Amino acid sequence: MAMTKHECTYCNFDEYDVIDKNDYGVILPEPNALTKGHSVIIPLRHINSFFEITDKERKSLQSLLELARNELKLRHQPEGFHIAFNDGDVFGDAQSDHLHIHIIPRYKNQPLKLDSRWGIISD
């Protein structure tokens, strides 16, 4: 994609990285994955908040989330999923001001270790 004026990482994703896509959103691999298969679902339109998306975008993102879940279950057989919305500019980085949904596969006997990206400061 062409660079946009706001230099958003999610607006400028590489088509080569796309796992799946529809008219309103895309599934991408999370570059700093917390577990095997960790992915993000993003709306194609640069938008800051889940509460600002249209009904069509909401349905599209839900469809992509379900598709990602089904594909991850098939490929990696996780025990479950941690699903998190990053809504608003809460972390102060270039990605956080573009709404995105993390789908993080959870595996038996593998604790989820969150870091400062999630507002968690290690002791």
Regions found by a protein language model. Give the residues of each.
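HIT superfamily nucleotide-processing domains
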Residues: 1-123
